[in-house]
Design a protein with these regions (language model features):
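Oxidoreductase and adenylate-handling cofactor-binding alpha/beta cores
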Residues: 161, 183-203, 216-227, 269-276
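Flexible, small-/acidic-enriched active-site or ligand-binding loops
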Residues: 284, 352-401
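Aromatic-enriched alpha-helical interface/lid elements that frame and gate functional surfaces
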Residues: 243-319, 323, 395
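Conserved Rossmann-fold dehydrogenase catalytic segment
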Residues: 135, 165-176, 198-214, 233-240, ...
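N-terminal helix-loop segment corresponding to the beta1-alpha1 unit
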Residues: 1-189, 193-199, 377, 383-409
Length: 409
C-alpha cells in the first residue's frame, strides 16, 4: 500500500511541471487520472526522437520524453472543450481529492473547470494551478516556458563561463530544472493542503508559478545579492564562496574537487603531494583562498596535468576529500552505487516487456514506492474510469461523437 493510497488526483496538466507532480503523487500511491485530448494526447507524446523501442528493437511512436513523466497514471481521453466532455470531468471531480492543471491563467474558466466551479461541486478539493507567472501581476496572462524562466529569474546569469573566457556566455541548465522544481514544490504544497484539510474539513487553492519557484531556488546566490548589494556573476564551475570547489583538467580529462573546509584543503594538499601550498598564508583559510583564488587555482591546475583523472581521484579519495569524476549519462546509470540503489527499474510495458525507466529516488521503509504500470497508451483507461458512472452504451455513443477516445470495450 502506498503512502497516498486512497487519494484521487484529477490531472489536467500537460508537458512537464504538472505531470512531474502527478507522477510523484502516483508513485506514492495516489490514483492519478490523466486527462488527454482525444486522438492527440499530451504534447510530449510526439516529442521524439528518441522513440521507445519495441520488443524487437524497432522504433515506436512513443517518445522517451512522455515515458519519463507519466508512469503509474491512468489515461482518459476526453474533449474538455465540449459540454459533454466537461460533464465527464465534473463526475471525476466530485470524488477527487486533488486537481492539477497548468493552463494559462483563466483559460479553464470558459470550460467550467476552474477552481471556483469545481469547488462548488466538491468543497474538499485541493486545486493546484501551475502557470509561468502566477494568477496575478502584470504578466499573469502570459504563457511560461522553462527556458524563458531560466533567463528571467537570473539563473542563466550565474550559469556558464564569464564573457571574457572562451566559450563564455549565459547558459541554460541541461535539463528543464524550473519545470522539475515546480513539480516538486507543487507536490509539497498539495500534500500540505491535504493535511490542512484533515484539520479544517475543506480544500483550498494553490497558486504555483515557474518564475516564483526559480527565484526562490536561487537560494544562497539570491541571498548573496541581498546581503552584499552585488549581483553574483558567472564563474563557470567555480564556487563563489568556497575554494577549491570546481573542475580541474588532468592529463586525460576533467574531474571535480569540492573542498568544503580548511581541513579538507589541508588533506588535499597532502594527498596530491603538494604540501608546500600550506606554507603560504594566503591559502590556509578559505576566506583567503577565495580572495586569492587567482593565485591558487593556476598552481593547482598546472599540478593536475601530471596524472590522469583516475589517478588523482583515487589518491584524493583515499584521504576522504570530496572528489569525483564527470560521468556521461550512460556512465552514471551504470555507476555501481546507482545500480545498488535500483534507480533504473523495469516495468512491464504493452510494447516492450524489457521497458526501463529511471525510478523514484524516494525510499520509504513502510510504504515503498511501487510501479503498478508503465506510462499509458492514449485513452488506455478511458472505459475503466468512466464506466464508474457511464454505461457501455453511453460510452460507445460518446466515442462515436468524438467526445472520448480509447479502449471502450
Amino acid at each position: 500500500m502506498g503512502a497516498l493510497q486512497g487519494i484521487r488526483v484529477l490531472d489536467l496538466s500537460r508537458v512537464l511541471a504538472g505531470p512531474w507532480c502527478g507522477q510523484i503523487l502516483a508513485d506514492l500511491g495516489a490514483e492519478v487520472i490523466k486527462i488527454e485530448r482525444p486522438r492527440v494526447g499530451d504534447d510530449t507524446r510526439m516529442w521524439g526522437p528518441p522513440w521507445m523501442p519495441d520488443q524487437d528493437g524497432n522504433m515506436t511512436r512513443e517518445s522517451g520524453y512522455f515515458q519519463c513523466t507519466n508512469r503509474n497514471k491512468y489515461s482518459v481521453a476526453v474533449d474538455i472543450t465540449t459540454p459533454e466532455g466537461q460533464a465527464l470531468i465534473y463526475e471525476i471531480a466530485k470524488t477527487a481529492d486533488v486537481v492539477i492543471e497548468n493552463y494559462k491563467t483563466g483559460s479553464l474558466v470558459k470550460y467550467g473547470l476552474d477552481y471556483a466551479s469545481l469547488s462548488e461541486l466538491n468543497p474538499n478539493i485541493v486545486y493546484c494551478s501551475i502557470t509561468g507567472f502566477g494568477q496575478d501581476g502584470p504578466r499573469a496572462e502570459e504563457p511560461g516556458y522553462d527556458f524563458i524562466i531560466q533567463g528571467m529569474s537570473g539563473l542563466m546569469s550565474i550559469t556558464g563561463e564569464p564573457d571574457d573566457v572562451a566559450g563564455g556566455g549565459a547558459q541554460k541548465v541541461g535539463v528543464a530544472v524550473v519545470d522539475i522544481q515546480t513539480g516538486l514544490y507543487s507536490t509539497i504544497a498539495i500534500q500540505a493542503a491535504l493535511i490542512a484539510r484533515s484539520h479544517t474539513g475543506r480544500g483550498q487553492y494553490i497558486d504555483m508559478s515557474l518564475l516564483d519557484v526559480q527565484v526562490a531556488a536561487l537560494a544562497n546566490q539570491g541571498m548573496n545579492y541581498l546581503a552584499s548589494g552585488k549581483a553574483p556573476q558567472r564563474m563557470g564551475n567555480q564556487h563563489p564562496s568556497i575554494v577549491p570547489y570546481q573542475t580541474f583538467k588532468a592529463k586525460d580529462k576533467e574531474f571535480i574537487i569540492a573542498c568544503g573546509n580548511d581541513k579538507q584543503f589541508k588533506d588535499l594538499c597532502i594527498a596530491i603531494g603538494y604540501p608546500e601550498l600550506l606554507k603560504n598564508e594566503k591559502f590556509v583559510r578559505n576566506q583567503d583562498r577565495v580572495k586569492y583564488r587567482n593565485e591558487l587555482i593556476p598552481l593547482l591546475s598546472e599540478h593536475f596535468l601530471q596524472k590522469t583523472a583516475k589517478e588523482w581521484v583515487d589518491m584524493i579519495h583515499a584521504l576522504k576529500v570530496p572528489v569525483g569524476v564527470i560521468n556521461s549519462i550512460e556512465d552514471a546509470l551504470a555507476e555501481p552505487q546507482i545500480v545498488h540503489r535500483n534507480l533504473v527499474v523495469n516495468i512491464p510495458h504493452r510494447l516492450n516487456e524489457n521497458f526501463q525507466t529511471i525510478g523514484s529516488p524516494i525510499k520509504l521503509s513502510d510504504t515503498p514506492v511501487e510501479y503498478h504500470h508503465a506510462p499509458p497508451e492514449l485513452g488506455e483507461h478511458t472505459a475503466q474510469i468512466l464506466s464508474r458512472f457511464k454505461t457501455a452504451e453511453e460510452l460507445a455513443a460518446l466515442k462515436e461523437k468524438g467526445i472520448i477516445d480509447g479502449k471502450i470495450a
